[in-house]
Structure formats: structure tokens, C-alpha cells
Amino acid sequence: MKKAICIMLLGVLPIFVFCKKEPDRVTVQHILIAFKGTIPKEDLTRNRDEAELLAKEIFERAKNGEDFDTLVKEYTDDQHPGIYKMSNIGIDPDKSKDEYSRARMVKAFGDISFKLGVNDIGLAEYDPETSKYGWHIIKRIE
């Protein structure tokens, strides 16, 4: 079931309700900032605190307009270019476009990705349940 974000504007009369439905599909690019023990990468030595500081620094740099692809190349603990096409819950993935179902992604990654507008940047913070691989700095590109 797709989620909708609704805002009620209360005036004298009538009451207006504006709903923004999540898109059926998105394409995002992301930077994964992991720490030792979250992914099988032997040369990863940073601890959780170091990863959090680095992720927040990169997030701010991206929000301030640094080239996102350059940041991905320099910092991601995932593969470059780190681009994922996703279909929302209830929408069949288009296999011909290498699209993933949102349900296959970690929850925080999917939640942030589908809330962003095109060219917006968001941060999915590490959580052992919803973002178990580390911090994801996400830019929606389509």
C-alpha cells in the first residue's frame, strides 16, 4: 500500500486537505558510510562514531552543492556509481530496467528515497533494524 502525506489547512470553512502520494518509482544515487562489522569489507577500520561523523560531514557537503557523483567515488563503501532504481510497494519492479522492489531494500533507505523530491538529498541514519549497513546519503535523481 502506498503512503500519502496529508496536510490539513484549517480555515473558517471549508477544510482543505492536500495529500502528496509517494511516487510509483524512483531512481537514487547513494553513498554508504559503513563501519567495521556492518559489511564484509576487510579493509574497513572506522568505528561507529567515526562513521557517523563522516556521514554527517558528507551529507552537509552534498546539501551545500558539492558534486554528488564525486562524493560517491571518494567515500562510498558500496560500489560506484551507487545508483538504484526502485518500485514502490505494490508496484511490480521492471526487470528490464534492473529495478528493485522497495521491499528488498533496507527500510530506512526505501523510506527516505520515496520521500525525496528530484535532486533532493536525504540521510538514512544507521539503525541495527532499519539501516543495518551504516549511514546512507541519498540523492533522488529521477
List each model region and its residues.
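Positively charged n-region of N-terminal signal peptides that target proteins for export
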Residues: 1-4
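Repetitive helical segments and hydrophobic/amphipathic motifs
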Residues: 11-12
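Acidic/histidine-rich, surface-exposed loop or edge segments in extracytoplasmic proteins
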Residues: 29-41
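Bacterial Sec signal peptide processing site at the extreme N-terminus
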Residues: 20-30
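C-terminal motif of bacterial Sec signal peptides marking the signal peptidase cleavage site
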Residues: 15-18
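Peptidyl-prolyl cis-trans isomerase
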Residues: 45-142
